[in-house]
Amino acid sequence: MQIQSQETTAEGAERIEVVPETLDDLWHLSYVIEPGDLVSGDTTRRIQRNDDNLRDKGGEREPMWIQIEVTDVEFAKFANRLRVGGEIVDCSREDQLGFHHTLNVEEHTELTVEKHLKPDQADRLEEAVEATENPDVAIATVEEGEAHVHTVAQYGTEERATITSTTGKGEYARPRKELFDELASVLKRQDVDAYILAGPGFTKQDALDHFQDEIPDIAEQITVVDTSAVGDRGVHEVLKRGAVEDVQQQTRIAEEADYIDELMARIGSGSEVAYGPEEVAKAADYGAIETLLVLDERLRLERAGEGDWDIDVDQIIETTEQKGGDVTVFSAEFAPGQQLSNLGGVAALLRYRLD
């Protein structure tokens, strides 16, 4: 993420000109931009008159600059864009004021956002700027007859390929070389800077030996990790053991996996923990929170007035920080975030038990 400029408006809001550079940056912006914000940028639009009829029946779009007051935000991961919709409040064509418009924000789209930044949103922007230099990582997990490839992004992991076959002995057995060749082909297609090769037993080492002969440039970028499983379980083990941190220091997913494991362990033992909005708000008031864990999707819903909490989520965050606690915002796209969602979307690791 590039921040081209930032200034405070006469109304006390922040006016920030940003340029998202990656899909991760669009994901970050989906949790910074919220209803009521002012967002502006260049776009194209079919011209409408006040009677709602299209002036141009041919459907041609006219380029223009617009500013909208945001009503809805959607991170369309599979379309590689962020959709920001709202009412046009300023425009290079005055006859378009008051109509609804959706800005389709893609990588390298210049965008200006005016809003009162909350502390976690300012942190998220800073994280996105710092993450620009982080390497992208692919995780290949392999065992006899089976291989999977995932890529790691800040919004979660994504499965890129699954390869299954019968290897070993027998009339219909597929030579291991074919499995390794197909895996190598998948790895070559990934636009990443580093690779992790994981799995149980010796198959991964045999695969690495094959890669050193067939794709030596990629083999030089591979880190080998022992896991007890492949696929999603194997990837979780890789993240939990910190292997991704070795090649992508700023990734948040490994940290989330550690936090959720600690949270579940404390719940199991009945020790210093709180979960659910009421319990966590009480812990915040007592100054007992060491680390607050909150789901990004829950933040968005509550701030938009679409949630079901009776507790103000921003008040929990502010109270926690004022009393010396840390705040970690979880991604709903990754397994630890899904586990946190099952606990109400918010939990806390405490300094001491609350009776």
Swiss-Prot record:
Chief place of localization: cytoplasm
Gene Ontology molecular function: endonuclease activity; metal ion binding
EC number per UniProt: 3.1.-.-
The keyword Metal-binding is annotated on this UniProt entry: yes
Family (UniProt): Belongs to the eukaryotic release factor 1 family. Pelota subfamily.
Keywords (A to Z) from UniProt: Cytoplasm, Endonuclease, Hydrolase, Metal-binding, Nuclease
Protein encoded by which gene: pelA
Domain of life, per lineage: Archaea
One BP annotation, GO: nonfunctional rRNA decay
A GO CC annotation given for this chain: cytoplasm
Top-rank EC class of the record's enzyme: hydrolase
Swiss-Prot/TrEMBL domain comment: The N-terminal domain has the RNA-binding Sm fold. It harbors the endoribonuclease activity.
Cofactor(s) required for function per UniProt: a divalent metal cation
Protein name stated in the entry: Protein pelota homolog
Assembly and oligomerization: Monomer.
Chain's role: May function in recognizing stalled ribosomes, interact with stem-loop structures in stalled mRNA molecules, and effect endonucleolytic cleavage of the mRNA. May play a role in the release non-functional ribosomes and degradation of damaged mRNAs. Has endoribonuclease activity.
Compartments in which it is found: Cytoplasm
HAMAP family: PelO
Signal peptide annotation: none
